[in-house]
């Protein structure tokens, strides 16, 4: 099923498949430095589903920006280059993860035109939230996700 999902994803012009958070990677590499940067909450989003779709794009001129996305200290998207083509990932968020989560967008580089900037779209069933972000080597933007009652 996983390979079929990947094939379907490639056919419609985006990458990646669903994953469950506990199977993700511990923070390694440059993203391991996330605690050394200031984290700035730029938006709070209330969600109702047990899975969310994350969609990443470069925001404006494609200049080589690369980000890692970290959910509650787990890398869920490692070192993803941003472009005008959507990068999509479905993440499962079981109730056992709690009702308040922090999604950090960690700049792995600044691209050729600082700062590192992009657009994150979070899809929660039929609800869609667009979050523009900017980060650099001193601060990382974060989205707070709160589960609806």
Task: Tell me the role of every PLM-derived stretch.
Residues 1-71, 77-149:
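Terminal leader/tail segments of proteins
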